[in-house]
Amino acid sequence: TQELEILRRTWEQSKQSACFTVMVGRRRIGKTSLLLESVKGTKYLYLFVSRTSEPLLCQQFQKDAAEALGIQIFGTITRFRDLFEQLLIFSTKKHYTLIIDEFQEFANVNSSIFSEIQNLWDQYKGKAKINFIASGSIYSMMMKIFENRKEPLFGRLTSKITLQPFAVSVFKEILNDYNPRYTPEDLLCLYMLTGGVPKYIDLLMEAGATKKSKMLDMVTSPDSPFISEGKDLLVSEFGKEYGTYFSILQLIASGKTIQSELDSVIGKNTGAYLANLEREYSLTTKNRPMFSRPESRKNRWSLNDNYLQFWFRFIFPNQSLIEMGKYDLLREVIDRGYEQYSGLVLEKYFRSKIAEEERITGIGSYWNNKGENEIDVIAINDLDKTAIVAEVKRNPKKIDMNILQSKVHSVKELAKYKVELQGL
């Protein structure tokens, strides 16, 4: 993969001069396995930051350093800065990789660790031959640590990698390996539940859940990891404000996508929360109609993560069924809403597929001031002046190309493109 190439190139570069890389990505995306794959067969030290006291953490790290690198540090180290200094000194003699996983958790251990790392890094980087990688899954904290001008580690990075879920073509291939006779319905269900997150695909495939019905059976079984996963992922991200954030995400997942609708249900202005969800947490996107101006007020909000969208649509609102152990009724709720909900996911699937496969410079949807005259997919190429305009329906027989053609005529900006109509 592209990320693996960047990591290997950085490793090579770090033999000459110290490199500092950050890798960010949601939990379960496969950061750790990718990092370990990139340093296979080389000298490396992997440290995992857990929420514990600094002396206890250092005790564990001291043991890890002795085992992985043979560094003997006499006496008991109780401050991370002392250990980090020893690791940097070691790298002036021997080249190796230092991976610190869940790096943002240092904030809960001792927040001054970041400035201590910065001081020591600035002091030793000229002579160190170290490939230092900080990996983290709480997006907001990682961005604050490395991209906020007021933070000590701002401007210290050699490179930054944001790990994304698998592309459509990749998880299609994976499903085909496990079930060569899969149907489009099976593929859509896999996309709807996992969004291409490797760990979720893995859980389903390893359990033999390669068909739609089996996938939904597994997700709604009493021991399903998918039931509590949404809460596990986000409570630590949001802290004590999580109640309001969860309510907003539940409303967006249920189809209330305009801020005024959200404000009236929540009973207060949700603007600041929505801005945080988009900028700090990267969980939502403010969608504007294609060709509209940046200051357009016709915005609609959507969730970026397919699994979380599914969780907020079906699992979170039905906690009472789960607490009563009525998993059969939870499955019934999903079955009833499946047709309509998966139709919306299908639009997203085709947007991802077109973005991956076609030569385009922009992609989105269209609706007018009244929220009418909707077009599911408009993909444009400003270099060739071509556009793909598509209507997406679960039942392609319901697509009327004449209506789509008349919608195209009503969007004056499309007049300068050679338009190809598609029914998907």
Residue ranges and their predicted role:
Residues 1-332:
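Phosphate-binding site recognition
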Residues 2, 297-424:
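A cross-kingdom feature that marks ATP-driven nucleic-acid transaction machinery
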